[in-house]
Each structure stands twice: as structure tokens, then as C-alpha cells.
Amino acid sequence: NKAFLCSKGGKIILGKDCMLASDVTIRDNDAHDIINKSGEITNHPQQVIIGDHVWIGMRAIILKNSEIGSDCIIGAGSVVVKKFPENNLMIAGNPAKVVKKDINWIR
């Protein structure tokens, strides 16, 4: 099972040759609008960019306004909440952080 939750006005960009394990969630939104006292929406969708050849581990969650460079690995159960534009990273944890650099992976 994989979930791509994209809102009106949002965008999820998934590069070529990515590999997603089961129960991966990628969201460009918060599921529900949050409004201020004037009734204006304060939590607009923000795009998610995932580069080419990215391996996303089981039960990883990638949230709005996140970016992952090419040739990266996202560890199982990780929660990505920010931008990691550099290539060849191993990213893991909650919240996700860089745990190794200069890596790559093969199927």
C-alpha cells in the first residue's frame, strides 16, 4: 500500500526509477484546512519533490514542503519534514536527518 495525497493547488513530483516499500505516505497537505480569525486558510498545500532513483523504506512519511535529492535512501519509519536537496544521502529518523553521505543503492 502506498498513499499519495495531493490537494488542489499542491504538487508531488516523483523522479524516475524510485523504489517505494509498503505503507509509504507522501502528502503535500495537512488533510484539513486551518483558518485564522478572519476565516482565511493558513496552511496551504506545499509541493514535495523527490529526485530520481530514491529508495523510500517501509512506513516512511514524507510531508509537505519536503525535498529529497537523487540517489538517496529514506529509512523505514522516517518522517521527512524539510528539504534535503543534496544527492547520495541516507536519511532516517523522526524527524528525519542525514545519517550518511556519499551513498548509493542498487536493486
Residue ranges and their predicted role:
Residues N1-E67, N94-P95, K101-I103:
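Flexible, glycine/small-residue-enriched loop-and-beta-strand segment within the central core
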Residues W55, I73, M90-A92:
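Short-chain dehydrogenase/reductase
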Residues G69-C72, E86-N87:
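Conserved catalytic segment of ABC-fold P-loop ATPases
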Residues G77, N87-N88:
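Tight coil/turn sites that cap or link beta-strands
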Residues L89, A96-K97:
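A short acidic/histidine/glycine-rich donor-binding loop in glycosyltransferase catalytic cores
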